């Protein structure tokens, strides 16, 4: 978009087997679960909006939610955040120092309901002149990653816990959005060469015809976040936003430069995704999927969803017809 650049998905907890981290120590599911504190009320020191009633930390990284969000969603989010940055406490510290936090939407809450993203309700998207800004953003995003100016990221509880009706059931939104936050609130504060190097890799990938017409071709930020999803074996494949690449092995073969950036940031820690229903133990012990609510798009957003999907499909058709020289990135 032109005036507003908060990275949101258009549209992933993990079973962690014992792996070797970049430092040689095993990263295990037990390690992740033992690191999780209890869900509590937000501490006064967090200075949160009264909207938030629940709070947890992943190694000091704050995760917040309203009273309507399941405690299990907060614990799952903390688990994933802990494991993704198992090798990079320095990046996590930089994110926290920048003011970053993760905000979880209840299944019946939407992006502009969150205090950190309420301002989007007044930010008209120029490609959708017939849509109210609030409807556009509420239909467009079940997760946002933040950027250099906006510290916060978000995701929906229905995706974290695998509720019926989850519109993005084939992937984990937290992994994508947290990747943006790791990039733009963490890594770039530690290594000022990272973003210029990533931009150059993106430019070369576009010149080589990689990711043509797919979401990874939108800009270098989405290029990285989509790569991170595949690095953790968690992406959709073969639809209007994705090609066949959805695993680490496929990413290494298809775009080794992007894989190298993922390795640089995350090392060899691996998340092997399975739905919560397959692993009701440890931090999910006691969770009963049969009692979970269903996610339903409200009627007020149906037209916005139709227009957004048509736009995404048209983007894919146009870019697929363009020469493999790249095009100006249009960020979201």
Predicted regions and their residues:
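Bacterial N-terminal signal peptides
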Residues: 7-15
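N-terminal mature-domain "stem" immediately C-terminal to a signal peptide or N-terminal signal-anchor/transmembrane
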Residues: 26-79
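Bacterial Sec-dependent signal peptides at the C-terminal "C-region" and cleavage site
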Residues: 15-31
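Pan-zinc metallopeptidase signature
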Residues: 228-332
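Acidic/His-rich structured neighborhood in mature extracellular/periplasmic domains
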Residues: 51, 58-61, 69-209, 241-244
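An amphipathic alpha-helical core segment
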Residues: 194-251
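Ser/Thr/Asn(+Pro)-rich, low-complexity disordered segments
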Residues: 47-48, 54-55, 198-201, 311, ...
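Bacterial N-terminal signal peptides that target proteins for export
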Residues: 1-7
């Amino acid at each position: 978009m032109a005036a507003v650049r908060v990275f949101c998905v258009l549209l992933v907890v993990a079973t962690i087997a014992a792996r070797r981290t970049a430092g040689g120590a095993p990263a295990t599911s037990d390690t992740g679960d033992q690191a999780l504190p209890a869900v509590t009320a937000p501490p006064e020191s967090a200075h949160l909006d009264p909207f938030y009633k629940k709070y947890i930390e992943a190694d000091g990284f704050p995760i917040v939610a309203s009273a309507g969000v399941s405690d299990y969603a907060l614990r799952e989010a903390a688990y994933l955040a802990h494991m993704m940055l198992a090798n990079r406490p320095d990046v996590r510290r930089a994110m926290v120092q920048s003011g970053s936090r993760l905000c979880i939407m209840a299944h019946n809450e939407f992006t502009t309901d969150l205090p950190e993203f309420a301002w989007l309700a007044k930010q008209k998207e120029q490609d959708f002149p017939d849509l109210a800004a609030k409807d556009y953003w509420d239909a467009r995003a079940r997760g946002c990653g933040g950027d250099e100016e906006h510290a916060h990221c978000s995701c929906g509880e229905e995706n974290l816990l695998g509720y019926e009706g989850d519109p993005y059931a084939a992937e984990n939104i937290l992994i994508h959005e947290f990747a943006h936050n790791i990039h733009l609130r963490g890594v770039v504060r530690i290594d000022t060469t990272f973003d210029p190097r990533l931009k150059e890799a993106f430019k070369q990938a576009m010149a080589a015809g990689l990711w043509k017409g797919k979401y990874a071709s939108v800009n270098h930020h989405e290029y990285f976040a989509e790569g991170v999803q595949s690095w953790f074996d968690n992406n959709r494949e073969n639809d209007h936003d994705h090609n066949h690449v959805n695993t680490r092995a496929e990413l290494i073969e298809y775009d080794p430069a992007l894989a190298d950036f993922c390795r640089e940031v995350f090392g060899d820690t691996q998340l092997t995704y399975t739905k919560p229903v397959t692993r009701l133990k440890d931090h999910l012990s006691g969770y009963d999927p049969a009692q979970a609510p269903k996610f339903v798009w409200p009627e007020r957003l149906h037209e916005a969803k139709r227009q957004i999907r048509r736009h995404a499909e048209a983007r894919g058709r146009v870019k697929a017809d363009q020469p493999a020289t790249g095009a100006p990135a249009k960020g979201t």
